[in-house]
């Protein structure tokens, strides 16, 4: 994984999109210039079983066409089965050590909320960590309270060689604050899923100093 792959990290599941077909939204985002994509299929109406796997493969094919890393959220076995570029897990998900073993040399991202969790991720050779929610978010029903940028600043100073992506309520207005705090990239859900003009929204993110393509 290249550090710059985190610069504009799009996360999406079918429940995050209401006004367009999810695959249409994904392709628009890919065409506009996102640098990484994570399939996060959650919620009461989330796809399951074969329907979920078929949708995952369609997302993967689009990412491959645009040469953008395809990451699966939580489901390590699905990531292995698909030959995904990586998997992202939380502290409450499958044990990080097991995920690292199954994913071999593919990308492993881990959500962290404290110095202790950060060290656990490092000890198990995570390729990057996700820190958040930085700001209030409605995209995750189980999201923790906003943590602001303090821990993000601490983590980036303590672990300057560890790629960090920030998530949670980030948009084109507040993203610059996150980059100044030390994030290598921003992960967004609503900012793109609810955008009326995805190309313009991506362009705003890319216009920031740290966003380059």
UniProtKB/Swiss-Prot annotation:
InterPro entries: Aldolase_TIM, ThiamineP_synth_sf, ThiamineP_synth_TenI, TMP_synthase. It comes from the Bacteria. One of its GO terms (molecular function) is thiamine-phosphate diphosphorylase activity. Binds 1 Mg(2+) ion per subunit. Its cofactor is Mg(2+). It is an enzyme of class 2 (transferase). GO terms for cellular component: cytoplasm. One of its GO terms (biological process) is thiamine biosynthetic process. It catalyses: 2-[(2R,5Z)-2-carboxy-4-methylthiazol-5(2H)-ylidene]ethyl phosphate + 4-amino-2-methyl-5-(diphosphooxymethyl)pyrimidine + 2 H(+) = thiamine phosphate + CO2 + diphosphate; 2-(2-carboxy-4-methylthiazol-5-yl)ethyl phosphate + 4-amino-2-methyl-5-(diphosphooxymethyl)pyrimidine + 2 H(+) = thiamine phosphate + CO2 + diphosphate; 4-methyl-5-(2-phosphooxyethyl)-thiazole + 4-amino-2-methyl-5-(diphosphooxymethyl)pyrimidine + H(+) = thiamine phosphate + diphosphate. It holds the Pfam family TMP-TENI. 4-amino-2-methyl-5-(diphosphooxymethyl)pyrimidine binds at residues 38-42, 73, 111, 140. Pathway: Cofactor biosynthesis; thiamine diphosphate biosynthesis; thiamine phosphate from 4-amino-2-methyl-5-diphosphomethylpyrimidine and 4-methyl-5-(2-phosphoethyl)-thiazole: step 1/1. Keywords: Magnesium, Metal-binding, Thiamine biosynthesis, Transferase. The keyword Metal-binding applies. Condenses 4-methyl-5-(beta-hydroxyethyl)thiazole monophosphate (THZ-P) and 2-methyl-4-amino-5-hydroxymethyl pyrimidine pyrophosphate (HMP-PP) to form thiamine monophosphate (TMP). NCBIfam families: thiE. This is Thiamine-phosphate synthase. It comes from Lysinibacillus sphaericus (strain C3-41). The gene is thiE.
């Amino acid at each position: 994984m290249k550090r710059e792959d985190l610069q504009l990290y799009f996360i999406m599941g079918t429940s995050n999109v209401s006004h367009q077909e999810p695959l249409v939204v994904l392709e628009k985002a890919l065409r506009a210039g996102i640098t990484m994509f994570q399939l996060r299929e959650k919620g009461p109406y989330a796809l399951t079983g074969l329907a979920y796997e078929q949708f995952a493969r369609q997302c993967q094919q689009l990412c491959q066409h645009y040469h953008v890393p395809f990451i699966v959220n939580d489901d390590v076995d699905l990531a292995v089965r698909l030959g995904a570029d990586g998997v992202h897990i939380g502290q409450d998900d499958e044990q990080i050590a097991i995920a690292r073993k199954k994913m071999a040399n593919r990308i492993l991202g881990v959500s962290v909320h404290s110095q202790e969790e950060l060290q656990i991720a490092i000890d198990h050779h995570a390729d990057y960590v996700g820190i958040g929610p930085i700001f209030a978010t409605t995209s995750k029903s189980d999201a923790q309270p906003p943590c602001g940028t303090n821990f993000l600043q601490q983590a980036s100073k303590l672990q300057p060689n560890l790629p960090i992506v920030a998530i949670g309520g980030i948009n084109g207005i507040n993203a610059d604050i996150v980059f100044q705090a030390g994030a290598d990239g921003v992960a967004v859900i609503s900012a793109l899923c609810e955008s009326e003009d995805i190309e313009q929204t991506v362009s705003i993110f890319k216009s920031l100093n740290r966003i380059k393509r």
